[in-house]
Amino acid sequence: MTNIRKTHPLMKIINNAFIDLPTPSNISSWWNFGSLLGLCLIMQILTGLFLAMHYTPDTTTAFSSVTHICRDVNYGWVIRYLHANGASMFFICIYAHMGRGLYYGSHAFRETWNIGVILLFTTMATAFVGYVLPWGQMSFWGATVITNLLSAIPYIGTTLVEWIWGGFSVDKATLTRFFAFHFILPFIILALAAVHLLFLHETGSNNPTGIPSNMDKIPFHPYYTIKDILGVLLLILTLLMLTLFTPDLLGDPDNYTPANPLSTPAHIKPEWYFLFAYAILRSIPNKLGGVLALLFSILILALIPMLHTSKQRSMMFRPFSQFLFWVLVADLLTLTWIGGQPVEHPYVMVGQLASILYFFLILILMPVTSLIENKLMKW
């Protein structure tokens, strides 16, 4: 008799995706992040669901309801901080996953890569609207500043901003709709992730060498299920360490002050995972220019398959490209640091240089270096 997992319509899908999936035998731990992102998403949806049971999306009670969750709900503080720090873990995994894709040339799978870019945008939108919900000072002013950027759009900007706000300022209508968006978007992410996986399984996984591995495949289970469990344990350990020992390490103290439209915080800044983009935005003195730079700093990822000029897929055997890749990582870390600093000398200058380097590396240096490496191969 044939095994049920190979005949049952539902089990067959699970089997082909997670059990009998032919996988390259040489993929490293950098390939763990996909499954970790799935785990993060499920964890965020579950903790978010329990938080939504006690949260009230109203300007007068939102801040108090979060306090109530932390003080009065059984283990509410654990759920709240798991959710807040879970978002940080989510973005750490996203950036590692993207870095892996860039380094090993996973962008050759166009559809998978492009859906990944859409997933990134959706996740960033979810995190942004979620940060507004506790209705602290940074929530309120973050929402005001970021939504206000849309007013830089010529002709329709101001109307668009007021339409998003649902009034003439960030108020009750804004909070209610942001809660609605924050609830629905993770399920859209879930659907997109399924499509992401669907396209990936059309081609099969890439591997560190970037060379087709069809002649050397092993089943996903037990080899990679066991390997993924190690990543899962490390992720859970890190998340629990953060949540139970230093739950506010990555947060902003200003968000423990209830939102007050009459008093602006000294330094308005987003969560750490948006600081690199925020630094690029701030480094351009023109409002519209800054908004376009901010948008393009993420959209540039969609251009990466077109900017790939090397004859080799992976960077494994390309030392010059490897060097530039790590310069890019260092540059992004510099931008993240600058984004959290006040707008004053020397931070402004460092931010401008780092922003120029970011675009210069991706658009010019890396493609040109790849062409030079192609020439060197003929020597």
UniProtKB/Swiss-Prot annotation:
List, alphabetically, the CDD domains matched.
Answer: cytochrome_b_C, Cytochrome_b_N
The protein's topology relative to the membrane is: Multi-pass membrane protein
The protein's location, in the record's own words, is: Mitochondrion inner membrane
Residues binding heme b b566 are H97, H196
Kindly state which keywords UniProt assigns to this record, in alphabetical order. Electron transport, Heme, Iron, Membrane, Metal-binding, Mitochondrion, Mitochondrion inner membrane, Respiratory chain, Transmembrane, Transmembrane helix, Transport, Ubiquinone
- What species is this protein from? Caperea marginata (Pigmy right whale)
Q: What is the lineage of its organism?
A: Eukaryota, Metazoa, Chordata, Craniata, Vertebrata
* Gene Ontology cellular-component annotations: mitochondrial inner membrane; respiratory chain complex III
Q: Which Gene3D superfamilies match?
A: Cytochrome Bc1 Complex, Chain C
Residues annotated to bind a ubiquinone: H201
Q: What is this protein called?
A: Cytochrome b
What's a single GO BP term from this record?
Answer: mitochondrial electron transport, ubiquinol to cytochrome c
